[in-house]
Amino acid sequence: MEEFDKEQAIADIAEKLNIQKDKILYIEYSDLFQINDCVIPAVIADNIKVFQEYNLYFYRCTIPNLILEITIKSLEFKMCCFESSFIIRNNFDGYISIQDSIFEKDFGIFWVKKEVYKINVCKNIFKDVSIFENKILNFNF
């Protein structure tokens, strides 16, 4: 089995999210990468695969527009600001947690086809929320 190279993973995440490597920490005991205090530019389709490859935890980040319709490992957001749309839809699958964050525009979960086992969205400030036609087994809002 190939040994995990955390430095290469940090470089890969930094490149795909277009952020500085020093903003990323690897938390070994939980096998996640914590991304701190940065602005995430728009995530283009080719680079969204970063969410499939790594467990990511965003802390105090600004995120412009994020549409998730793929299978992810796990995503956590705490004290983040979503400047535009945050949408979960269609073929989304995985674990997601969003806490103590601000959504300046749209937040939506629609047409999720697979049974999603955990979506945790709590203690946030929303402007516009739409949730309909989903298969979510454990949803905390």
For each predicted feature, which ranges?
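Conserved long hydrophobic alpha-helices within structured protein cores
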Residues: 6, 97-103
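Short amphipathic alpha-helical segments that mediate assembly, nucleic-acid/protein binding
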Residues: 6-10, 19-21
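Short, T/G/N/S-enriched strand-turn elements that build extracellular solenoid repeat scaffolds
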Residues: 15-28, 37, 41-51, 64-71, ...
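Parallel beta-helix/beta-solenoid
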Residues: 55-57
